[in-house]
Each structure stands twice: as structure tokens, then as C-alpha cells.
């Protein structure tokens, strides 16, 4: 699809923000062999608790009942499949065309990481683009609109440690720090 769009619209640099690409690296690298890929890494427990909470809120709007067990099981399995494929296939993208960005490195260090990403991709980070990013970051601090309190145990009947135990392979491969359930159950 992207090749078809590029054909009609002329050559462009595509920026795709989706962790699902980690599950499709063989197809991505075969289709776009010169792609630069930024791999973002975060505690899967934080991702899962956010996803299942969001889905539960959405389900309240369109369903008469919610199945918390189904939500936690489905999304834990889904994220496990995605990350398993990403770990298995990560080396398909050579170091000179990829960068790994851990969530704990990103917060408060966005511009430095942005510079690294632009450099790796061979794209000029112009002063205007840098200023736009700085303006966006200044206007949108983390927690600007408040925060959501998560409680996997209470809402979904599973502890962060139970969920995390399925992802040792991911923590072993990448620089990922636990965010959930590591300080007296706080997120």
C-alpha cells in the first residue's frame, strides 16, 4: 500500500508509528529494504494495563457487560506474540538503519533522541523542525491532562508480576525497566 501511495504521490519519506511493525519485520524489510526503523521499548505491563483499561472504558459505551478476564488474557497474549516476533526478528534490520529507544531514556531526553534518530535516518533536523518539536514538548508535558490510576489486581484479577513473568525474554533482550508494580504496587 505504501509503495502504491508513493508511486502516485512521488518519493517521500514515510514515518510510521506503530509497534505492530515489530511483528512484521520480514515483510517490512523485504518491501522497504532501505527503511530506517526506530524500535521503541517499554515495560509490557505498562502497555497492557493501559490497553486493557482503555478497552474496558470503550466497552462500557457499547456493551452491557465487560469481561475483564477476556481483556487481560487477549491483550497479554497479543502483546506477547508481537514482542516475541520482534525479539526473534530484530536483527533483520541492521544497526546502521535502526535505533532502539527505551521509554525510560526518552522522557526528558526527547530532543537528544530525536537528533539521533534523524542522524541515523540521514535526514536533516532543520532549526525550524527542532523548534516545532521543542514547542510541542513545552506545550504538552506528560500528565498535562491528568493521569489514570491503574490497578491490574483489582480491575482484572492479575498482578503486575504475573503479567511480567511472561516477558522475561523481552527484558533480557532490550534495555527495558519495569514501571508497574515495582514500588509497593505503584505505577
PLM region spans:
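Flexible, glycine/threonine-enriched loop-and-boundary segments that flank and lead into catalytic domains
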Residues: 6-34
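Flexible loop/turn segments at secondary-structure boundaries
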Residues: 21-25, 45-48, 107-110
Amino acid at each position: 500500500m505504501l509503495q502504491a501511495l508513493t508511486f502516485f504521490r512521488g518519493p517521500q519519506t514515510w514515518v510510521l508509528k506503530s509497534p505492530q511493525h515489530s511483528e512484521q519485520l520480514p515483510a517490512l524489510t523485504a518491501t522497504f529494504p532501505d527503511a530506517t526503523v526506530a524500535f521503541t521499548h517499554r515495560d509490557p505491563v505498562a502497555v497492557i494495563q493501559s490497553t486493557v483499561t482503555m478497552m474496558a472504558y470503550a466497552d462500557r459505551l457499547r456493551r452491557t457487560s465487560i469481561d475483564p478476564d477476556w481483556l487481560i488474557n487477549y491483550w497479554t497474549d497479543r502483546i506477547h506474540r508481537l514482542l516475541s516476533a520482534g525479539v526473534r526478528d530484530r536483527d533483520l534490520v541492521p544497526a546502521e538503519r535502526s535505533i532502539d529507544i527505551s521509554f525510560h531514556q526518552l522522557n526528558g531526553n526527547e530532543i537528544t533522541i530525536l537528533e539521533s534518530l534523524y542522524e541515523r535516518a540521514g535526514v536533516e533536523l532543520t532549526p525550524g523542525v527542532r523548534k516545532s518539536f521543542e514547542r510541542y514538548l513545552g506545550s504538552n508535558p506528560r500528565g498535562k491532562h491528568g493521569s489514570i490510576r491503574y490497578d491490574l489486581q483489582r480491575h482484572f484479577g492479575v498482578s503486575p508480576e504475573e503479567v511480567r513473568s511472561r516477558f522475561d525474554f523481552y527484558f533480557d533482550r532490550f534495555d527495558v525497566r519495569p514501571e508497574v508494580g515495582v514500588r509497593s504496587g505503584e505505577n
